């Protein structure tokens, strides 16, 4: 079912905070990505895909190539070979801001909020870069605050927020441009278990609204609690792919990455 926010008809084209896409539609496909540094091939033919309405994880040991793969999707790193396709279009050579215009959102690992601005000012700072009227910005702001449970914190300075509240604000800012695909780098880093649970709940809500999400995080347990599918990358290649349950119980995944005593 397509998601349509309940807002005035005149404001909807600009005010919809989330863009619904038919579930299962392929949003992201990478074709045999290759990256070398100083004659060392750190990514060697990685192919992944993300559809609308699903959460996909990139997992693997440190130095396995998952971060480089993720950064090629984001646009921070350009592949030496292979393609990054978004909705059937090769975006391998596009800058990050051009990818954003097409509907690719990005939540960086580094703090991205303005500490001395309030929560609503942080969101407005992004909204003001969008082509819409002042009234439409107000409608969108109200909607985003409600969608990410930030309304009670709207007037709070960002530096007063907890780690989990800041992460919710960062996710909100990433949603301002109405992305169809959201890329999240270490969304669970630096936040406590309760905040992790809240962030997971929000990400599931976004998935259920039709967004596609690609996540990389060092917490395998929290990732596997959340994702619908995942890829375990080892030595620059996809070693195993499948559902969270499949990955958690795969003997090879447990031997090489998760550990034999791992459990969800």
Where are the regions a protein language model picked out?
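Conserved ABC transporter NBD signature motif
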Residues: 82-89, 102, 140
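Conserved catalytic motifs of ABC-family nucleotide-binding domains
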Residues: 178
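Catalytic Walker B motif of ABC-type/P-loop ATPase nucleotide-binding domains
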Residues: 182-186
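Conserved ABC ATPase signature
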Residues: 157-161, 165
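Helix-to-loop junction immediately C-terminal to a conserved catalytic motif
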Residues: 74
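Conserved ABC ATPase "signature" region
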Residues: 18, 124, 135-153, 200-204
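The feature captures the beta-strand-to-loop junction immediately N-terminal to the Walker
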Residues: 59-61
């Amino acid at each position: 079912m397509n998601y349509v926010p309940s807002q005035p008809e005149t404001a909807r084209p600009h005010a919809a905070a989330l863009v619904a896409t038919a579930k299962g539609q392929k949003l992201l496909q990478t074709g045999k990505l290759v990256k070398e540094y100083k004659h060392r091939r750190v990514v060697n033919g990685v192919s992944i895909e993300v559809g609308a309405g699903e959460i996909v994880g990139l997992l693997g040991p440190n130095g396995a190539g998952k971060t480089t793969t993720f950064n090629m999707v984001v646009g921070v790193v350009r592949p030496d070979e292979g393609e990054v396709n978004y909705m059937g279009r090769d975006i391998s050579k596009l800058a990050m801001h051009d990818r954003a215009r097409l509907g690719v959102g990005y939540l960086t690992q580094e703090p991205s909020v303005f500490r001395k601005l309030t929560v609503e000012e942080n969101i407005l700072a992004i909204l003001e870069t969008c082509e819409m009227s002042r009234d439409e910005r107000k409608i969108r702001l109200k909607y985003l605050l409600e969608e990410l449970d930030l309304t009670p914190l709207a007037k709070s300075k960002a530096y007063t927020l907890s780690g989990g509240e800041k992460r919710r604000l960062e996710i909100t800012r990433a949603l301002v441009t109405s992305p169809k695909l959201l890329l999240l780098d270490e969304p669970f880093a630096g936040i406590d278990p309760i905040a992790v649970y809240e962030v997971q709940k929000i990400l599931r809500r976004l998935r259920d609204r039709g967004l596609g999400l690609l996540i990389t995080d060092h917490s395998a347990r929290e990732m596997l609690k959340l994702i619908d599918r995942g890829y375990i990358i080892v030595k620059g290649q996809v070693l195993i792919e499948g559902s969270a349950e499949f990955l958690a119980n795969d003997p090879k995944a447990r031997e090489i990455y998760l550990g034999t005593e791992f459990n969800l």
